[in-house]
Amino acid sequence: MRTSSFLDRLISEVDSALRTLVLPPKRITTRQSPAENLADTVLSAQEKKHISGLMRVNHAGEVCAQALYQGQALTAQLTHIKEQMASAAAEEVDHLAWCEERLYELGSKPSLLNPIWYCGSVLLGALAGLAGDKVSLGFVAETERQVTAHLQRHLHYLPEKDKKTIAILKRMQEDEEHHAHTAMEAGAVELPYIIKQLMNAVSKLMTQSSYYI
């Protein structure tokens, strides 16, 4: 049986990048949006603007997560780790679709900075993979912990009447917690404090810029 070469994986990565960054009219998902059967809520122009900013940040975060997983799958050493990264990336596609759909409903669009975040995250993921599978899984666990905390903050910032966005973020939060738990069970190592702080600083830069652009 023919084994996957680095070139094969690189071509797959380019394909994944295009699928992530080039926005289709409607992205194909494996799961229905949590907001699918919820009624629309009357929102003021200011509320729509604020919610759009938050969802633009969440969408950018999912772009980063997708890229991180793809980069790690590119250099992961063990087959089951590669498969785990690919599975997690597939769930992140659902998150991308849900965020995109909600943005369009609000009359907005994703961040123009997404290509920058994607490239940086792919590089980080690939470097983490080269450092070893346990380190790579450590990046997954820490990334998902930070994303979970970030989603929790956004849930506090949303108007209570915006049931659609709340439902989406809660489901995303559940998935991210599961990804972190799975990574730890698979043997993730705890990252050094300085690395966690650096990741947090980059995350803040992404959130503050993507809210507006």
Curated annotation (Swiss-Prot):
Its EC number is 1.14.99.60. InterPro entries: COQ7_proteobact, Ferritin-like, Ferritin-like_SF, Ubq_synth_Coq7. It catalyses: a 5-methoxy-2-methyl-3-(all-trans-polyprenyl)benzene-1,4-diol + AH2 + O2 = a 3-demethylubiquinol + A + H2O. It comes from the Bacteria. One of its GO terms (molecular function) is metal ion binding. Fe cation 1 binds at E62, E92, H95, E176. Pathway: Cofactor biosynthesis; ubiquinone biosynthesis. Binds 2 iron ions per subunit. It is a peripheral membrane protein. It is an enzyme of class 1 (oxidoreductase). Its cofactor is Fe cation. It holds the Pfam family COQ7. Its main location: membrane. GO terms for biological process: ubiquinone biosynthetic process. NCBIfam families: DMQ_monoox_COQ7 (NF033656). This is 3-demethoxyubiquinol 3-hydroxylase. The gene is coq7.
